[in-house]
């Protein structure tokens, strides 16, 4: 019997004492199915130090009692060089590590490879299957297979299929509402207040009944079982599952939400797995956005272009719930959050599916895995296809090297600035100079025809493509083909949406490889590779800068793979020269009407052509400043970039100072927030937020790692740290407004205004009387 299945997820289990791979998916007729393959093989490779045939016999003889069942001698490659290897088959995946340890005592091999490849990954490689893709399977019914929520078959054979269509997936978005009176809610003490779900049609909410959250949890679990979603999506749901699991223990509920009736469990990359379903935590995707500072759901939604109303902050939850007339607003917000999470998923789902198909990672892993792990997943597939052995992870010493070129900006404001983007430079350089661990020629080894890096003189072979460059060649060729296909389809079509998501995923993966090369945790880490790519990158940027200046263009800033250029008329000529003479792609990424640079690198603010502000590195985008300081800086920046009216900006700052000194600014805007990276008592340096956390702990608040602590600075003559008090324990009249003016508002405003020659005294209406001039009349 043949079936066609779209592979949703996979995991491994023991069936009748044997390793088996469980393939969960959606059939072409819309059924949810499980296919079980228990004819899987576990193996790893040895590089023998003596005759390979002798090693194979000795390993089989000595290893039988530990689980070795067969050995073969085969030809493979290590860093592009042919080697004879011994392939060691082991009865169970759980025994591989033990077998390697025991065999080490034989002292007949130099190194092991692929001993830490997960069985599910191995299976996909061996069968040529890819998550989020279609395959055909020859199956049979078997009454000995486990009885679970979906129909189950035993696999006899599989074959990948070339089909782009995505089945209609059942998706449920979930939002958990939790709070407590003192500090962050803890599952040991604090019940869940509400769970809101949205499946694209139906909105549901289950609430705490005032006595226990047992019924709330039972209703939620039953809904998951009844709706049987393929995808569960949340924001911060990794932590929510952990919280929910602890609550289930407290109220005696079985959290059986997997398709095999199993509980959620921690998997790779810090990901929580719900067996048979895709569990998506959008917070992981949000954390990849360098422009976000607070990582709240509404901030994240706005960053991807969604319109969102301001939300009640978490620190206000308990206050709202304690007031019957306000509580309903919070419950309504939870419902809206579930709908917002669903909306975000509809925006990102195509991208997630395409990235899954390209990397070979299940959909719920592509967001939790780091960019390096995603690149490595693709590299593993590429290495397998060319017979290259996959190195095992191991401890490697980190040796620093010089990174990308960052120019010192000239302080000032500039108009009509174009940003020339070289984001595809590093992939193209790695291709051009064949930069890869397996093409690197070690010092002392002969090479008659090599590429030589500009500074360190590292050498790379020209005679064959490396694993990195083979990967890049395929990625860039695929992206060109996809972009060409985009031209022939309508922009409002599903096909366009899918193709666009794919070309973005291909671009991100290609651009990731340069960073991966310098990641010490990489399986194929080689410092010389990363160092050489950086050298050729700096060399390329310097040549572009030199040419631009020869053409009479002004370069005001440069950062790794971008140049900020004035004189747009000559820009197209420069781009043509870069493409023809340097062989690199360059394009105008954005244009600023005006842009302001401070003297520091990586700190600027600009007014884009569409009228929006972009801020990099300034206080307004950093989390350790009070809201009043951030608001002031952002508005001063806006005034100056839009109007260049110094008097208007100074008047605005004076008004803020006056309102602050009069006490009319809300207390919430005075709070300075810091996240705890360790328990309060573990800090050796007692910074203000640590002292505030310790004070809260004394008063019964539960402060843990990851919690945000908010404090305000109060009046007094002692050190600032000693006057930093938890905002919850302070009355507004006790706030030291002079501190906020002198150490928050003025420094934040001056970061912008000093560029225009404004000094601090200019901000004071009556300098001789000092700050008291701004007090109450």
Question: Can you describe what each PLM-predicted range is?
Answer:
Residues 2-63, 152, 156-231:
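Conserved RNase H-like, two-metal-ion catalytic cores of nucleic-acid enzymes
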Residues 92, 165, 177, 695-777:
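Low-complexity, acidic/Ser/Thr- and charged residue-rich accessory regions of DNA metabolism proteins
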């Amino acid at each position: 019997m043949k079936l066609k299945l779209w592979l949703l997820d996979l995991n491994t289990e023991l069936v009748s004492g044997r390793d088996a791979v469980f393939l969960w998916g959606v059939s072409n007729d819309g059924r949810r199915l499980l296919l079980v393959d228990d004819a899987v093989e576990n193996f790893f490779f040895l590089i023998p130090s003596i005759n390979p045939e002798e090693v194979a016999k000795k390993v089989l003889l000595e290893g039988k009692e530990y689980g070795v069942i067969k050995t073969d001698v085969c030809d493979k490659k290590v860093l592009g060089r042919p080697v004879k290897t011994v392939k060691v088959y082991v009865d169970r995946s759980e025994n591989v590590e033990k077998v390697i340890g025991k065999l080490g005592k034989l002292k007949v091999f130099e190194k092991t490879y692929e001993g830490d490849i997960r069985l599910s990954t191995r299976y996909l490689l061996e069968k040529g299957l890819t998550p989020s893709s279609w395959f055909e399977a020859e199956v049979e019914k078997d009454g000995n297979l486990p009885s679970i929520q979906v129909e189950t078959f035993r696999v006899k054979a599989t074959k990948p299929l070339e089909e782009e269509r995505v089945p209609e997936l059942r998706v449920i978005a979930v939002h958990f509402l939790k709070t407590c009176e003192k500090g962050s809610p803890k599952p040991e003490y604090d019940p869940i207040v509400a769970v809101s779900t949205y499946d694209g049609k139906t909105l549901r909410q289950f609430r705490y009944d005032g006595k226990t959250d047992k019924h709330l949890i039972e209703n939620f679990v039953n809904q998951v079982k009844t709706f049987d979603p393929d995808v569960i999506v949340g924001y911060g749901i990794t932590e929510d599952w952990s919280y929910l699991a602890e609550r289930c223990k407290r109220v005696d509920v079985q959290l059986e939400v997997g398709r095999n009736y199993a509980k959620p469990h921690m998997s790779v990359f810090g990901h929580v797995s719900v067996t048979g379903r895709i569990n998506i935590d959008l917070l992981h995707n949000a954390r990849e956005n360098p422009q976000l500072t607070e990582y709240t759901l509404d901030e994240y939604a706005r960053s991807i272009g969604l319109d969102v109303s301001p939300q009640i902050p978490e620190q206000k939850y308990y206050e709202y719930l304690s007031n019957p007339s306000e509580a309903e607003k919070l419950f309504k917000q939870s419902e809206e959050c579930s709908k917002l999470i669903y909306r975000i998923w509809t925006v990102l789902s195509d991208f997630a599916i395409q990235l899954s198909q390209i990397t070979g990672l299940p959909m719920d892993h592509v967001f939790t895995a780091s960019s390096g792990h995603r690149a490595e997943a693709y590299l593993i597939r590429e290495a397998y296809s060319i017979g290259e052995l996959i190195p095992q992870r191991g401890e490697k010493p980190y040796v620093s090297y010089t990174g990308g070129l960052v120019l010192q900006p000239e302080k000032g404001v500039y108009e009509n600035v174009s940003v020339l983007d070289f984001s595809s430079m590093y992939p193209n350089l790695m291709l051009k100079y064949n930069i890869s661990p397996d093409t690197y020629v070690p010092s002392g080894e002969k090479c008659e025809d090599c590429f030589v890096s500009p500074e360190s003189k590292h050498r790379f072979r020209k005679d064959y493509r490396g694993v990195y460059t083979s990967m890049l060649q395929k990625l860039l060729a695929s992206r060109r083909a996809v972009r060409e296909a985009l031209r022939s389809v309508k922009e409002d079509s599903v096909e366009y949406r899918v193709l666009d998501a794919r070309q973005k995923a291909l671009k991100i993966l290609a651009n990731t490889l340069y960073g991966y090369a310098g990641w010490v945790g990489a399986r194929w880490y080689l410092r010389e590779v990363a160092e050489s790519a950086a050298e050729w990158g700096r060399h390329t940027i310097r040549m572009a800068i030199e040419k631009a200046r020869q053409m009479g263009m002004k370069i005001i800033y440069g950062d790794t793979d971008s140049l900020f250029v004035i004189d747009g008329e000559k820009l197209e000529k420069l781009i043509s020269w870069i493409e023809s003479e340097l062989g690199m792609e360059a394009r105008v990424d954005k244009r600023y009407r005006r842009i302001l640079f401070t003297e520091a690198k990586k700190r600027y603010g600009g007014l884009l052509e569409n009228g929006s502000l972009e801020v990099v590195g300034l206080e307004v985008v950093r989390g350790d400043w009070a809201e009043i300081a951030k608001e002031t800086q952002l508005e001063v920046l806006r005034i100056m970039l839009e109007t260049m009216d110094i008097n208007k900006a100074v008047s605005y700052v004076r008004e803020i100072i006056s309102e602050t000194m009069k006490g009319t600014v809300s207390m919430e805007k005075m709070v300075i927030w810091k996240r705890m990276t360790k328990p309060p008592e573990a800090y050796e340096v007692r910074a203000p937020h640590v002292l505030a956390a310790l004070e809260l702990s004394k008063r019964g608040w539960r402060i843990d790692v990851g919690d945000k602590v908010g404090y305000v600075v109060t009046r007094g003559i002692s050190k600032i740290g000693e006057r930093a008090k938890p905002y919850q324990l302070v009355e507004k009249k006790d706030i030291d407004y002079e501190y906020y003016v002198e150490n928050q508002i003025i420094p934040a405003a001056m970061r912008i205004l000093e560029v225009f020659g404004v000094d601090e005294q200019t901000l004071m209406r009556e300098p001789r009387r000092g700050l008291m001039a701004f007090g109450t009349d």
